[in-house]
Structures are given as structure tokens and as C-alpha cells.
Regions:
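Repetitive helical segments and hydrophobic/amphipathic motifs
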Residues: 16-17
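Noncatalytic, solvent-exposed loop/strand surfaces
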Residues: 25-423
């Protein structure tokens, strides 16, 4: 029976669909799909688009500036943004035809480079959990956006961040909300999802925070949280907060540049293996988790796939993503899951990079520079773009990861959000 990433986080009608894979109470209401691996459980999607692209159902230009993704729950869409003068981060609710129901301010943005909101909300049992760029974790009612509780990670935990503030989607399961403030006080904390009261905290490495959303896995009948700081990737007991392993033995390739301590992508987990990359011209790595979940060992590293912050997906033994190439000449990559061999290194849209997700056996790539959205047929030897169209509304880098729910592709570009029929 295959092992899957767990996120026991909500209203779990979706769990019935996943019963055969032994994933209990998985929900799609958060970051990069129900398992945080970029794969959306859709069926019957188009395998080719019209020349002009899929049918646009609606667009709105008022979500506020940001790089976060929308979250769809029932007949509502939720998304974070910023107010007009960019002094507050906001949480908004929309109908599924693009009509805004309300907008509520919840936190203080990052006050340096790229201040736009980053947190994709986690929606659980009528509550939204968000983290501001300045490190405030806030619980809101999705009915009206009113605040339920908040914890200031800077004041309470002496949060320590890198150059771009906090970028994390909270992990919510059981009665817990998981947050990674990093710094000298602690690394990761669990808060009561109803009150914000601290339930446990891990030890501290004194490390700077990463830009990684934690995930909950199950392996050999045991659960574990996998998280990251700028230097450490680690596993935590979800009940006690005890750190059960950590890995920071990256060697000289990782320390070769000034960008070595970034960590901008959520890891992939499958069958006891953890794939993780730090981007910024630094190698990616595959770790093997021990059967008792108490240690890891390095299986291989790959010099080509240094994904910036667009994520990666694994399909049929191939890891797909884009690479950084000194932030100017990205390409699209395929790497063998088992061996780490680079299978292809392909140019698309004039040396580009961006985000990638998967659904119904196809890949969806979003070019961060040109705004091209590509429908890609998975292959072991090439990056085969079957159809593509271009996002023309919105402003800034195309950094928000796309989302597919109920046959609709949602693409954000800054203050603009578009919905396309892909079924």
C-alpha cells in the first residue's frame, strides 16, 4: 500500500475519493493541492486547448497585490492580497463567478523588497489560517473575515527571517496549527487551532527561516511533520514537538555561493524518500527516511534541478520543474526519482522558469516572465508543450502557483485573478 502525505485538515468529503490510497481525511483546502505536492485530483480534463487558450470564465482585478494562490472550498474562493496603499495584508472571499463578498485586513506586510502578500490560506472547519509577511499568524472566520485569534511570531518567538520575510502556508491537522518562526527561541511551534494557545515548541538551531510550508506525512504507520529552515531540513513528532531527525550536511556544493541558505520549495515525499532543493544555483537532494522515522541518509544529489520557488511535481518516477540558472536563464527539467539522473533540460519561452503543477496526468507550467501557461504532456525525455496561452492582465512577476479545482484552472498575476474552463 503506497504511502501518502497526510493533511488531516478539514471537512473531508474528499477522503472518500482517496480511501484506496490509505490517506485519511485528506483535504484540498491549502497549499499546492491536498498533499502539498502540486498534484490536483481532477479527472476528465482537456488534453489539448484551443489555439486561443481555454475558455475564460471570469476575471477580477481587485484581489490586491500578491503571490499567493487561491483556495476553493465549496462554492467560495478565498485569497490573500494587500490593500490599496499596501499597508495591510487582506483576506477576501469570492463567489465562484468572481464576485467579491468581503475583504478583511489581517496583518502587516513585509516592509522590504517584494512586500506583496505570500501566504496561501489554509481553510479548516470554517476558519482561515494565514501568516503575514512580517510573521503574524492569524485565524479568521471565513463567514465574514473577522479575527478569531492572532500570535505575533516576531514578538512571541523572536522570529528570524531572510531577505524576503515570511512565506508559509500554515499546516493544520487534528487540533493543531503548525508555524515555523525559526530564530533563537524555537524553530517550529504548534498552536491550538481554536485559541492560538501554544501546545509545543521545538528546539532552536538559531537558524534563519526558510520559505517552505511544512507538511505532514505518514510512513510505516507513524506520522511526522517535515519542515525546513534556511539550513536544516528536519522531522518533528506531531504529538510532542520532539525533533526526530535533521539534515544539514549539504557539503561544498551548497556552500559555494552567497545564496546557499534560502530553501524556497516545499519538499516532495513518496515511499519514504524526501526530495528537497534549495534553488539559487544549489544542488537538489534525495534523502531516505529510516523505517523508525528517526534518521535520514543522502541517496543522491543533482546539479541541474535548482528550482527557484516554482515547486516541482513527481509523476511516474520523474521529477518535473524548472531551474534557476543564476536567475536569468532558466530551463525546464526532468530528473529520475530513483537515480537523480537528469533526463532532459529543455528551453521553453526563451530561457524561462516558473511554477508547475499536475492534474489528470498532465503538467501545467506557468512562465514567471512571459506569463505563458503551458499544458505539458509528461515524458521522460522532453518537455513537450501541447498547448499554451498567455496571461495579460495584472502586474509584477508571475509568481503565484496555479490551482485546478472542479475542472477550473485559476491563475493569479499580482492583483488579477482569472478562471479558465479546462474540462
Amino acid at each position: 500500500m503506497s504511502v501518502k502525505v497526510l493533511k488531516r485538515v478539514a471537512l473531508c468529503s474528499f477522503a472518500c475519493m482517496m480511501a484506496a490510497t490509505a490517506v485519511a481525511q485528506v483535504t484540498p483546502y491549502g497549499w499546492r493541492g491536498p498533499e502539498r505536492n502540486g498534484i490536483y485530483p481532477e479527472t476528465g480534463l482537456l488534453k489539448q486547448w484551443p489555439a486561443e487558450g481555454p475558455q475564460k470564465l471570469w476575471e477580477t482585478l481587485d484581489v490586491g497585490k500578491g503571490y499567493s494562490s487561491p483556495v476553493i472550498v465549496g462554492d467560495r474562493l478565498y485569497i490573500t492580497g494587500m490593500n490599496e496603499d499596501q499597508t495591510k495584508e487582506t483576506f477576501s472571499a469570492y463567489t465562484l463567478d468572481g464576485k467579491r463578498l468581503y475583504t478583511a485586513a489581517y496583518g502587516t506586510p513585509w516592509d522590504q523588497t517584494y512586500p506583496e502578500t505570500r501566504t496561501t490560506p489554509a481553510i479548516v472547519d470554517g476558519k482561515a489560517y494565514v501568516i503575514s509577511g512580517s510573521g503574524e499568524i492569524v485565524c479568521l472566520s471565513v463567514a465574514d473575515g473577522k479575527e478569531v485569534w492572532r500570535v505575533d511570531g516576531g514578538k512571541v518567538y523572536s522570529r528570524k527571517t531572510g531577505n524576503w520575510g515570511t512565506s508559509e502556508c500554515p499546516l493544520v491537522f487534528d487540533n493543531k496549527v503548525i508555524f515555523t518562526p525559526a530564530g533563537d527561541v524555537t524553530t517550529m511551534v504548534a498552536l491550538d487551532k481554536n485559541t492560538g494557545k501554544e501546545l509545543w515548541r521545538t528546539k532552536s538551531w538559531g537558524d534563519t527561516g526558510a520559505y517552505v510550508s511544512p507538511m505532514l506525512i505518514e510512513y510505516k504507520g507513524k506520522r511526522q511533520i517535515i519542515g525546513s529552515t534556511a539550513v536544516h531540513i528536519f522531522g518533528v513528532n506531531p504529538d510532542t514537538g520532539a525533533v526526530e531527525w535533521d539534515f544539514a550536511d549539504w557539503g561544498s556544493p551548497r556552500n559555494a555561493t552567497g545564496w546557499a541558505s534560502i530553501a524556497p520549495n516545499t519538499p516532495l515525499f513518496k515511499d519514504g524518500k524526501i526530495f528537497f532543493g534549495h534553488g539559487y544555483d544549489i544542488h537538489s537532494y534525495m534523502l531516505q527516511l529510516a523505517d523508525d522515522l528517526k534518521s535520514v541518509k543522502l541517496l543522491w544529489q543533482n546539479e541541474t534541478m535548482d528550482t527557484h520557488h516554482g515547486g516541482y511535481v513527481e509523476l511516474n518516477g520523474v521529477i518535473y520543474g524548472s531551474n534557476h540558472h543564476n536567475n536569468s536563464q532558466g530551463t525546464w527539467i526532468g530528473v529520475d526519482w530513483n537515480t537523480g539522473e537528469t533526463l532532459f533540460d529543455s528551453n521553453w519561452e526563451n530561457k524561462s522558469k516558473g511554477s508547475i503543477i499536475a492534474a489528470d496526468g498532465m503538467l501545467y507550467a506557468y512562465n514567471e516572465r512571459s506569463g505563458a501557461v503551458g499544458l505539458v504532456k509528461p515524458a521522460r525525455d522532453k518537455f513537450e508543450v501541447i498547448s499554451q496561452f498567455r496571461i495579460t492582465k495584472g502586474s509584477g512577476p508571475h509568481w503565484a502557483h496555479p490551482v485546478i479545482v472542479d475542472g477550473v484552472l485559476y491563475v493569479r498575476h499580482g492583483e488579477a485573478l482569472m478562471a479558465y474552463k479546462v474540462k
